[in-house]
């Protein structure tokens, strides 16, 4: 198990609009359960997949984190101190490295991915970043792609052109 200082989800496609040139990263302090379950509003980063530029960052007020309690040997939510609630859970270099991993996992599987990641407290950067789950993105990946020809087939367009009268100047 990763001793997570931060964790969350990452999409190799913008899940809001299907933009394949963007990576969306959401995260919070502690283990990813807080993000996946919706118990916290995560920080959100929109990154250009080609330039690795962070185009948008929304730092949320995170009230708690999901952590391992070594005394009880159980996972639990603990309240964050007020001065830490609006602190960014990721450094910019971590956002960029997660984006690099996003590109690799998408290239490996050949389609946009919905992944979960975790950053270890005890390992140095970038060895501290782990992808703990990857699966095909399920919303935009299932949508039927609109043909560049519209609803007509290539044959329909060719046949239409062949039957269209043309004027020939003599």
Regions found by a protein language model. Give the residues of each.
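Conserved mixed alpha/beta core segments that line enzyme active sites in large multi-domain catalysts
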Residues: 1-170
């Amino acid at each position: 198990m990763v001793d997570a200082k931060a964790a969350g989800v990452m999409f190799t496609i913008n899940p809001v609009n299907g933009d394949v040139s963007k990576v969306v990263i959401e995260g919070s302090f502690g283990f990813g359960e807080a993000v996946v379950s919706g118990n916290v509003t995560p920080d959100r980063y929109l990154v250009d997949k080609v330039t690795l530029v962070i185009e948008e960052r929304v730092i949320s007020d995170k009230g708690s984190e999901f952590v391992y309690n070594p005394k009880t040997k159980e996972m639990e939510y603990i309240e964050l101190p007020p001065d830490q609630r609006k602190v960014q859970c990721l450094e910019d270099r971590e956002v960029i490295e997660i984006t690099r991993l996003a590109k690799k996992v998408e290239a490996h599987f050949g389609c946009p991915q919905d992944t979960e990641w975790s950053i270890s407290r005890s390992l140095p950067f970038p060895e501290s970043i782990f992808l703990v789950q990857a699966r095909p993105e399920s919303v935009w990946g299932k949508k039927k792609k609109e043909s560049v020809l519209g609803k007509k087939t290539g044959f329909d367009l060719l046949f239409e052109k062949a039957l269209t009268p043309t004027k020939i100047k003599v």
